[in-house]
């Protein structure tokens, strides 16, 4: 437990999708999904590192001297998959591992047609939050709640001290829409208020 929150793997002991999900499919990350998720994350991180991210409010974003590529972590992915398998939209209460605190990004898309979830589009939703980020704030993560809601997925994705990512996906029928629900867990966690987003 952390601050009274029960860890996702302890709270939800079944590896199967919850009855909350109703009709579901695609309840696992494929090798191709993993490759896409890593590529989209690392393409943006390399772009930032090179000083080529021109977007922002205002931009351009500063270049980074320390921006390692993320690598996949199966433990983080297993916790993310267990969480999306609950079909509860939002962040889980505790997802930390012994190694470090763990951050999380979530995204959702919907379609009337059933088909594979588009990992590129889901991750791009987080990257597009750069449009709201004031480049001057990279040196110290702002704590303003309303502002954080607009930039927090992006800032975790490019957090300089984060090195690992692991994700889970599920597609479930919600009324007439097939919803794709993606969660990615990041270690060590980013979005520490007052700390540099990257250096």
Curated annotation (Swiss-Prot):
It is found in: Secreted. Belongs to the CRISP family. Venom allergen 5-like subfamily. Its main location: secreted. InterPro entries: Allrgn_V5/Tpx1_CS, CAP_dom, CAP_sf, CRISP-related, V5_allergen-like. GO terms for cellular component: extracellular region. This is Venom allergen 5. Disulfide bonds join 21-87, 167-184. It holds the Pfam family CAP. Residues 47-67 are annotated as: Disordered. Expressed by the venom gland. Keywords: Allergen, Disulfide bond, Secreted. Residues 38-186 form the SCP domain.
């Amino acid at each position: 437990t952390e601050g009274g929150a029960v860890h996702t793997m302890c709270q939800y002991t079944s590896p199967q999708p919850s009855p909350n999900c109703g009709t579901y499919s695609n309840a696992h990350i494929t090798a191709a999904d993993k490759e896409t998720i890593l590529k989209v994350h690392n393409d943006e991180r390399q772009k930032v590192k090179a000083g080529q991210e021109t977007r922002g409010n205002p931009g351009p974003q500063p270049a980074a001297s320390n921006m390692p590529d993320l690598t996949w972590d199966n433990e983080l992915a297993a916790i993310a998959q267990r969480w999306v398998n609950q079909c509860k939209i939002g962040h889980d209460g505790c997802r930390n591992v012994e190694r470090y605190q763990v951050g999380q990004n979530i995204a959702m898309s919907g379609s009337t047609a059933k088909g594979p979830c588009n990992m590129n589009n889901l991750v791009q939703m987080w990257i597009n939050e750069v449009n709201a980020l004031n480049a001057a704030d990279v040196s110290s993560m702002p704590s303003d709640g309303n502002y954080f809601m607009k930039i927090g997925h992006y800032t975790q994705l490019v957090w300089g001290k984060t090195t690992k990512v692991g994700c889970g996906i599920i597609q479930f029928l919600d009324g007439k829409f097939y919803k794709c629900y993606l969660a990615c867990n990041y270690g060590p966690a980013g979005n520490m208020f007052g700390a540099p987003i990257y250096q």
